[in-house]
Structures are given as structure tokens and as C-alpha cells.
Design a protein with these regions (language model features):
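Alpha-helical membrane-inserting segments
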Residues: 17, 21, 25, 50, ...
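Small-residue packing motifs within transmembrane alpha-helices
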Residues: 5, 11, 40, 47, ...
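Alpha-helical membrane-associated segments of multi-pass integral membrane proteins
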Residues: 4, 11-15, 19-22, 93-132
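Hydrophobic alpha-helical membrane segments
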Residues: 43, 65-91, 109-113
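Membrane-interface helix-boundary motifs at transmembrane edges
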Residues: 2, 53-64
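Interfacial non-cytosolic loop connecting adjacent transmembrane helices
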Residues: 26-34, 80-108
């Protein structure tokens, strides 16, 4: 079983860069606030397409696709809480629990990310088989 994670690696790297920029320049959040709905829509489309591109470039079984969607979502959504932990450690020399930063909103974002990624994988898989 060979899984090609090149599309996801590019997406994860860009997401990491965006989070680093956010930590360096937090005021940019307020400048982008009016476009939040458009950015959420674009983010959802990107996650769907990354999932589709990942499965098209590698043939995997159904359980592997679900596990891949879970791990990819967990890795992506964990970037911001880990950054918050590092920022607190740098500023205050104090480390809080990971669960302290992983609020209910992160669980909802995680669920949406996983479902979109998995949906992209499934549609990509079935379109290769000629079922879509």
C-alpha cells in the first residue's frame, strides 16, 4: 500500500506558514475579518480538493482512507494549539496542557476538516472507478 501525500504536504506547509504569519502579525486577523466567510469557503474547497488529489495519486482501501483523513485533520488542526503552547512558553516560560488550547471550536473545525477531506477522497476514488 503506497500513499502519496505530496498534495497534503504542500497544503500542510502553507497552513503552517499562515499560522506563523498570524503569530508574528496578529493584527492581520482584523484586516481579514470582513472576508472570513469567503476564506472559509475557499478553505473548505481546498481541503476537499487536497483529499481528492491524495486519493487519485494513491490507491488505498476504505479504512485507510478514513484513517488518513483522521490523521491529516488532526495534524492540520493541531498546528494552532501547538503554536499557542510555544508562544506561551516563549513569553511566560509556562506550558499549559494541550487540552487547554483545544477548545470546542477546534473539535468542530476538526470534524468539518475530516469530513471534507474524506469526502474528497471518496469522490476521487469513485470517479476513478467510473462510478461518478
Amino acid at each position: 500500500m503506497k500513499v502519496n501525500l505530496t498534495p497534503f504536504s504542500i497544503y500542510l506547509f502553507l497552513f503552517l506558514i499562515l499560522n506563523v504569519i498570524y503569530f508574528i502579525f496578529p493584527f492581520l486577523f482584523f484586516l481579514l475579518l470582513p472576508a472570513v466567510f469567503v476564506m472559509i469557503l475557499i478553505w473548505g474547497i481546498c481541503v476537499f480538493e487536497i483529499g481528492r488529489a491524495t486519493i487519485i495519486s494513491s490507491q488505498t482501501k476504505r479504512i485507510t482512507r478514513v484513517i488518513l483523513a483522521f490523521l491529516a485533520s488532526l495534524l492540520t488542526i493541531s498546528i494552532n494549539p501547538i503554536g499557542m503552547i510555544l508562544l506561551d512558553f516563549i513569553n511566560w516560560r509556562h506550558i499549559n496542557s494541550f487540552a487547554h488550547y483545544f477548545s470546542k471550536a477546534y473539535w468542530i473545525i476538526f470534524l468539518i476538516h475530516m469530513l471534507l477531506f474524506w469526502l474528497g477522497e471518496e469522490i476521487g476514488y469513485f470517479s476513478q472507478k467510473g462510478l461518478f
